Amino acid sequence: MAAACAGAFVAVFACTQIALAVFGNTKSVASNTLSTSTMAAPTGLAAAGGANIVLTWTATATTYATGYNVLRSSTSGSGYAQIAQVTPRATVTYTDSPSAGTYYYVLQSYFQNWISANSTQATAGVSTNTGYLPCTANAQDAGGDANGYEVSPGNACANDSVFAQDVNSGTSTSTSCTAAAKDKHRFYNYGFSIAASSVINGIQVRLDALKSGTGTVPKLCVELSWDGGTTWTTAKNTATITGSEVTYTLGTTADNWGRVWASTEFSNANFRLRVIDVDNTTTQTFQLDYVAVQVTYTPP
């Protein structure tokens, strides 16, 4: 019986009672009790996207844990695969640099071959951009002289120091971007290729321009349309235009011009850019070498 009980002890590390025969006497030994430990996952997982994805979390409460497994998926709630192992336990950040897209993350605490359950999920995306794309079409708009850039307007669709010109611009001395008496011109058909359901992060407009007339506060104002020119954003304006060609950039990679955009609104049928020439004189000549647009977005 003693041998059988000893074998059970080796197998399961416990024996409720061992009967020992020592010189014909029997002695009872108290039972042994095993405790269990559940390894805790880290808490508070968060993800911040952009050019890459930064994960942050609160360390596991399991003090003997070695570190963390980092798992990633392109599908919410499933399909996770381990992409990294982070040590020591006190580490609470990890930077991932996948290709553009939206990703889902969970963490596990680990010690040797033991792992915890998954943490809560966090999600973030890596953005990309279209690059600066030129217009391929243009049209004068109502306002001012009603002729916009009347001299070679197509020149503004190429970056070559050959200029479109708006001569003797406007019919009033107002310096407001919204004044009806200011010359306006539309530039469009940028040929954007943005994946459906992408999140639009920001829109930047590049204007290469100079002025060659009188007036003291010349500037270019820009409005954007998402419905073919029916509705427009609030205008943004450049600094004062000088007599030398300068590149002006309006908007940032995180500036959506006051609205939430859908990827479909950048089609050639929908997207329009309107340039409005403004100065405190009607004898100013605006020269525009290049109009280009860059869209920063996060694919689905």
Regions from the PLM with identified roles:
Residues 1-24:
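Sec-dependent, cleavable N-terminal signal peptides
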Residues 129-300:
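Disulfide-rich extracellular domains of secreted proteins
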Residues 24, 108-112, 276-278:
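Beta-strand-rich extracellular modules
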Residues 69-100:
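Recognizes extended acidic, P/S/T-rich segments that occur
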